[in-house]
Amino acid sequence: MKVYAVLGDPIEHSLSPVMHNAAFQAMGLQASYHAFRVKIPRLRDAILGADAMGFGGLNLTIPLKESAISVVEPDETAEAIGAANTVSFQRGIRGHNTDGIGASLALRHYGVNVRGADVLLIGAGGAARAIAYQLSKDGAEIVVTNRTPERGLALASDLGLEFRPFGEIDDLVRVSDVVINATSVGMRDGDPRLFDGSILKAEQVVFDIIYSRETELLRDARRAGAKAIDGVMMLVYQGAAAFRIWTGLDEPVDVMEAAVRAALGRLNL
C-alpha cells in the first residue's frame, strides 16, 4: 500500500485526506492519505524521511510551500513561482506547484475567462504567487496588493507584475473585473474586512480561496449581486492535478468534489 500525506502547521483543518482517500477508493488503488503537522525547521527531515520510507507523494500547505524549494528539485512551474505544494518521488524528489492551475480551472469551472480582465490579487504568500503566475499566463492583467508591502513588491517584481500599496485597496477594487483574496483573512471569526464590501458591483467576480467557510467577503459579494466563488473547486482541482502527477491516472474530479462538500457539510452543521 502506498502512503501519501499533507504536511503543514496547522494541519487539523485540512480536507486533503478526505478528498484523496475518496479518490484512491474510487479508482481502486491500494493507497492511503494522512495529515501530519510539520514545522519549517523539520521540513527537510520530513520530506527526506517520506522518500526513505517509500511514500507515494506529499502535499505541502501553510507555511511550508516556499521553504520546500530549497529541499526539492523544482519543476519549471514551481521554480518560477518560488513555491511547491506537491512533492513526487518517482524520479528523485521533485517539487511541483498545482495551486495556480487549481485556481485557473476553478475560475473556468464557474465560467470566468480572465484573458484581458483586470484582476486585483490580494496577498503575497505561496498561493498568491501561484495564482499570479498562472493567471498571468492565462492573459489576465494583474495588480498585486498586500498588507506587508515588501512581500507584495517581491512577488510583483519576481513575476513582472504591478504592485500597489494596500492603502489604495478601495480604489483598486472599484476598477477591477476580478477580485481575488489569497490571504487567510476571513478564515476566523472576528477577522477585519479587507475593504468596504459596499463598493462591490454586480458585474464583478469575487474569488476567495478560503474553502472552510463562507467569508464576509463572499457575503458582501452576494449582497452586491457579484459572482461569488469560494475556494472549494481550487482545492479540488489542485488536488486533482497532484493525483495525476503521482499516479499518472485521470483524476476523479466529481468524486473529490463530493467528498470535500460532504465533509464541509458535516463541519458546518
From Swiss-Prot:
Gene3D superfamilies per the record? Leucine Dehydrogenase, chain A, domain 1 (3.40.50.10860), NAD(P)-binding Rossmann-like Domain (3.40.50.720)
Function statement: Involved in the biosynthesis of the chorismate, which leads to the biosynthesis of aromatic amino acids. Catalyzes the reversible NADPH linked reduction of 3-dehydroshikimate (DHSA) to yield shikimate (SA).
Task: Tell me what organism the protein belongs to.
Answer: Methanothrix thermoacetophila (strain DSM 6194 / JCM 14653 / NBRC 101360 / PT) (Methanosaeta thermophila)
Its pathway is:
Metabolic intermediate biosynthesis; chorismate biosynthesis; chorismate from D-erythrose 4-phosphate and phosphoenolpyruvate: step 4/7
Q: Which SUPFAM superfamilies does the annotation name?
A: Aminoacid dehydrogenase-like, N-terminal domain, NAD(P)-binding Rossmann-fold domains
Q: Gene symbol?
A: aroE
Entry-linked InterPro entries = Aminoacid_DH-like_N_sf (IPR046346), NAD(P)-bd_dom_sf (IPR036291), SDH_C (IPR041121), Shikimate_DH (IPR011342), Shikimate_DH-bd_N (IPR013708), Shikimate_DH_fam (IPR022893), Shikm_DH/Glu-tRNA_Rdtase (IPR006151)
Positions that bind NADP(+):
E76, G123, A124, G125, G126, A127, N146, R147, T148, P149, E150, R151, I209, G231
What's the protein here called?
Shikimate dehydrogenase (NADP(+))
Question: Keyword Chloroplast on this protein?
Answer: no
Q: Which UniProt keywords are given for this protein, alphabetically ordered?
A: Amino-acid biosynthesis, Aromatic amino acid biosynthesis, NADP, Oxidoreductase
Say if the entry is tagged with keyword NADP.
Answer: yes
Annotated binding of shikimate, by residue: S14, L15, S16, T61, N85, D99, Y211
Family the entry assigns? Belongs to the shikimate dehydrogenase family.
One of the GO BP terms on file: shikimate metabolic process
Query: Which reaction equation describes what this protein catalyses?
Result: shikimate + NADP(+) = 3-dehydroshikimate + NADPH + H(+)
Q: Where in the sequence is the active site?
A: K65
